[in-house]
Amino acid sequence: MQQLTIAIDAMGGDFGPQVTVPAVVQALSQFPELKVTVVGDRDAISTQLTHLNYTLNPRFSIVHSDSVIGNNTQPSKALRHSRGSSMRMALDLVASKDVDACISAGNTGALMGLSRFTLKLLPGVERPALISPLPTKNNQRTWMLDLGANVSCDAETLFQFAVMGSELAEQSIGRKAKVALLNIGEEEIKGNDQIKRCAEMLNQCQNIEFIGYIEGDKLYQGIADVVVCDGFVGNVCLKTSEGVAHLFLDQLKSQLLTSKFKQILAKWLFGDVISSLKGLNPDQYNGASLIGLRGIVVKSHGSADISAFNNAIKEAVHEIKRQIPNRISDRLEAVLLERHY
C-alpha cells in the first residue's frame, strides 16, 4: 500500500484548528495509508485533540509554528515575513519532499505567492491556476479555471490553463475532456482579443478536444468537462454561483422546517429530489487545486466546516495517487512538441 503524506496549515481559514484538526482525524480513519503533519500552534492543536479524545500517534504529527498569515495580508508582505508561519512551513515540507501535498484555508494571494516561491513552476508554465469542480446535470462535474489566481491572462496563459485543466479532469473522468472557453456568446466574433487568439490556438491543437465558447448560463449543463477563463471572471462566477446555491438551499430548508408535518410530507413526496439537491451544496466541492507547480497544493475555502475541509483532504489524496504534477508536466511537453511540428 502506497503511503500518502500531507501537510496541513492548521491555522488558516476562519476557524483554524477547530475545523482543520477534526477534519484530519476524520481523514485518517478514511485512509489507512495516510500520514498527516499538522503545522500550527501546538497548544491550540493539542486542545482540539483533547476535545476529540484523540491520542498522538505516528500517523498524526505536530510541527509548531509561531505565526499565522492574516487574511488581509498583502502577498508581497506575506512573502517577506512568511518564515515561521504555518502556511510557509507547510509548503516547505512539500518543497523538501518530506510530504506529498499541502492544504491550506488561508490567504489565497499569499498561498499562491508562497507556492510559486517555494515549489517553483513546472517547466514551460507561465502562471499557476486555481481549478475546482462544479456540479452539473446528472451528477456530473465540470472543472473550471482560473478561479482567482490570475486577474488577467493573455492567450498563451489561457491555452496552458486548458492543457493543465484537461489533464486534471481526465484523471477523474477517464476519457478525453471536452474543453470550452467561457465567453459572452457562442459566436466566433464574440469576446476579447485574448479569448479569440486562445480559441485559434486550441483549434489547432490535436491534443485538446476544444468544443468552442460557452456562456455562463450553460456552465451547469454538463456540456464541457473543462471551462477556461481568467481569474477575475472565474472568481466572480464561482462566488455568485455559491451564493445562489446557498440561498436556494437555505430557502428550501426554512420552508420545510416550519412544522413537523411539512418535514414528514416533504420527505415522503420529495425525498429523492431533496437528496439530489444536496449535490448543489458548495461544501461538497471544497478544495481548489493550485496547478502548474512542482508539487500539490490544495486551497480550502476559508469558511469551510469540518466536512468541507475533509473534502479538500480527499482531493489532495486523489492528486497524490494520480501523480498530477508529473502528468501535467508530461502533457505540456507533448503539446509543446506538437506545436513545434
UniProtKB/Swiss-Prot annotation:
Keywords, A to Z, come to: Cytoplasm, Lipid biosynthesis, Lipid metabolism, Phospholipid biosynthesis, Phospholipid metabolism, Transferase
Q: Which reaction does it catalyse?
A: a fatty acyl-[ACP] + phosphate = an acyl phosphate + holo-[ACP]
Pathway listed for it? Lipid metabolism; phospholipid metabolism
Q: What is its main location?
A: cytoplasm
InterPro entries noted in UniProt: FA_synthesis, Phospholipid_synth_PlsX-like
For biological process, the GO terms are: fatty acid biosynthetic process; phospholipid biosynthetic process
Location(s), subcellular: Cytoplasm
**Enzyme superclass (EC):** transferase
A GO molecular function annotation here is: phosphate:acyl-[acyl carrier protein] acyltransferase activity
Q: Keyword check for Lipid metabolism, yes or no.
A: yes
Gene Ontology cellular-component terms for this entry are: cytoplasm
Q: Which SUPFAM superfamilies match?
A: Isocitrate/Isopropylmalate dehydrogenase-like (SSF53659)
Q: Which family does it belong to?
A: Belongs to the PlsX family.
Q: What is its biological role?
A: Catalyzes the reversible formation of acyl-phosphate (acyl-PO(4)) from acyl-[acyl-carrier-protein] (acyl-ACP). This enzyme utilizes acyl-ACP as fatty acyl donor, but not acyl-CoA.
Q: Whom does it interact with, and what assembly results?
A: Homodimer. Probably interacts with PlsY.
Please give the HAMAP family that the UniProt record associates with this protein: PlsX (MF_00019)
Q: What is this protein called?
A: Phosphate acyltransferase
Q: Which species does this protein come from?
A: Aliivibrio salmonicida (strain LFI1238) (Vibrio salmonicida (strain LFI1238))
- Lineage, top ranks: Bacteria, Pseudomonadati, Pseudomonadota, Gammaproteobacteria, Vibrionales
